[in-house]
Swiss-Prot record:
Region (Disordered): 1-222, 235-267
Phosphothreonine PTM sites in chain numbering: T74, T78
Cited InterPro entries: CD225/Dispanin (IPR051423), CD225/Dispanin_fam (IPR007593)
Native organism: Mus musculus (Mouse)
Main function: As a component of the outer core of AMPAR complex, may be involved in synaptic transmission in the central nervous system. In hippocampal neurons, in presynaptic terminals, plays an important role in the final steps of neurotransmitter release, possibly by regulating Ca(2+)-sensing. In the cerebellum, may inhibit SNARE complex formation and down-regulate short-term facilitation.
Biased composition, class Basic and acidic residues, residue ranges: 12-30, 106-121
Record's keyword terms, sorted: Cell membrane, Cell projection, Cytoplasmic vesicle, Membrane, Methylation, Phosphoprotein, Postsynaptic cell membrane, Synapse, Transmembrane, Transmembrane helix
Protein name (Swiss-Prot/TrEMBL): Proline-rich transmembrane protein 2
PANTHER family: NG5, PROLINE-RICH TRANSMEMBRANE PROTEIN 2
Low complexity compositional bias, start-end: 69-82, 96-105
UniProt superkingdom: Eukaryota
């Protein structure tokens, strides 16, 4: 009876050990991933079992998290798991080959394995927590970059529209000024005379700016008045010299003020003094007439040199007339004398 009871107790112990060993490999398969990682990394075998006062370093979290799934896919069987599988297949041989462990030891092993699993799970939980905070910080930075990038593109370069406006604003004022000055000229009789009218006046100057001076009372342009005053002064100077013609001849305005169509104007040729014709008339027997013609020819040349074109022209006409009279009269006198002399001798 004692032998049979001892055998029964041995059989129960073998069954309990086989159950615990079969449960052990399951726990080992589930929890050996991080444990084997710890075994494969010889530099940190003890640092991966944090106590209550020890915290895992966040620097080594990257390689641990990367190595854990690789080891779980290809678990390596330890000699304990190999022995457990052999014992589960043939419990009788296992009981003969190796002494059966006591139930207290078998219970302590699975109890220690869940502790290891909890520690590894706590480490894995702390690892994503340590790696998680940088992610949200990087996302706002990316959002800030994406928000800050469209700003320079959304703001177009400022256009200078005000540069083209000032000339457009000045045009109406200039037009109004020109219109107002044109009306003033028409009302004040300041409109210049056109060519061929026969009246004295300045030539039109379209490119000259409009004069802002008030027109005179008589309606004549100020330039014409100034030239008239100058001509009066010149005429008075000529009247003072001895041997000069009357002052009335030189007091008239010069023909330079007339238009191109007026006689003696800019369009006409330079007036002639007829001094050669006067010299030829001197050979004729009309001495008082030809001498006067020669004097007028000399005066017309002097007036032309001084700029009095009108006076030179008038004096030239007188010299021409007198010289022609002297020539014709002299020729007639010569013919008459010849006829008389030939008739007397016959």
């Amino acid at each position: 009876m004692a032998a049979s009871s001892s055998q029964v107790s041995e059989m129960k112990g073998v069954e309990d050990s086989s159950k615990t060993q079969t449960e052990g490999p399951r726990h080992s398969e589930e929890g050996l991933g991080p444990v084997q990682v710890v075994a494969e990394i010889p530099d940190q075998p003890e640092a991966l079992q944090p106590g209550p006062g020890i915290t895992a370093a966040p620097v080594d979290s990257g390689p641990k998290a990367e190595l854990a799934p690789e080891t779980t896919e290809t678990p390596v069987e330890t000699p304990e798991t190999v022995q457990a599988t052999d014992l589960s297949l043939n419990p009788e041989e296992g009981s003969k080959a190796s002494p059966s462990p006591s139930p207290s030891e078998a219970r302590q092993e699975p109890a220690s394995k869940p502790d290891v699993n909890r520690e590894t799970a706590a480490e894995e939980g702390s690892e994503p927590q340590s790696t998680a905070p940088p992610e949200p910080t990087s996302e706002p930075a990316f959002q800030i970059n994406t928000q800050s990038d469209p700003q320079p593109t959304s703001q177009p370069p400022p256009k200078p529209p005000l540069q083209a406006e000032p000339p457009t604003q000045e045009d109406p004022t200039t037009e109004v000024l020109t219109e107002s000055t044109g009306e003033k000229q028409e009302n004040g009789a300041v409109v210049p005379l056109q060519a061929g009218d026969g009246e004295e006046g300045p030539a039109p100057q379209p490119h000259s700016p409009p004069s802002t001076k008030t027109p005179p009372a008589n309606g004549a342009p100020p330039r014409v008045l100034q030239k008239l005053v100058e001509e009066d002064r010149i005429g008075r100077a000529h009247g003072g010299h001895p041997g000069s013609p009357r002052g009335s001849l030189s007091r008239h305005p010069s023909s330079q003020l007339a238009g191109p169509g007026v006689e003696g104007g800019e369009g006409t040729q330079k007036p002639r003094d007829y001094i050669i014709l006067a010299i030829l008339s001197c050979f004729c027997p009309m001495w008082p007439v030809n001498i006067v013609a020669f004097a007028y020819a000399v005066m017309s040349r002097n007036s032309l040199q001084q700029g009095d074109v009108d006076g030179a022209q008038r004096l030239g006409r007188v010299a021409k007339l007198l010289s022609i009279v002297a020539l014709v009269g002299g020729v007639l006198i010569i013919i008459a004398s010849c006829v008389i002399n030939l008739g007397v001798y016959k």
